[in-house]
Amino acid sequence: MECYRMSNIVTCQPWEKFCYKEVTMFFPNHPVHLSGCASECTETNSKFCCTTDKCNGAGSG
């Protein structure tokens, strides 16, 4: 999956916006911030947007 940067928003497709749901898991050493892509990103919640590695799938083909 390729990523495209439009302004401050990184999308998986040049015509789409992808947002993530935030999940914070606290492990003994340090908190780990996890996020997964979801479609239907609106202008009002676009502050939660995928980073490039999230768009790229991060481990899945």
UniProtKB/Swiss-Prot annotation:
Domain of life: Eukaryota
Tissue occurrence: Expressed by the venom gland.
Keywords: Disulfide bond, Secreted, Toxin
Disulfide pairings: 3-19, 12-37, 41-49, 50-55
Family: Belongs to the three-finger toxin family. Short-chain subfamily.
Function recorded in the entry: Shows no cytotoxicity and does not inhibit the binding of alpha-bungarotoxin to nicotinic acetylcholine receptors of muscle and alpha-7/CHRNA7 types. However, it potentiates the binding of alpha-bungarotoxin to the acetylcholine-binding protein from Lymnaea stagnalis.
UniProt source species: Naja kaouthia (Monocled cobra)
A GO molecular function held by the record: toxin activity
SUPFAM superfamilies the record matches: Snake toxin-like (SSF57302)
Record-given protein name: Nakoroxin
Location, primary (coarse class): secreted
Coiled-coil region(s): none
InterPro entries on file: Snake_3FTx, Snake_toxin-like_sf, Toxin_cobra-type
Cellular compartment(s): Secreted
Misc note: Is classified as a P-type cytotoxin, since a proline residue stands at position 28 (Pro-31 in standard classification).
Gene Ontology CC annotations of this record: extracellular region
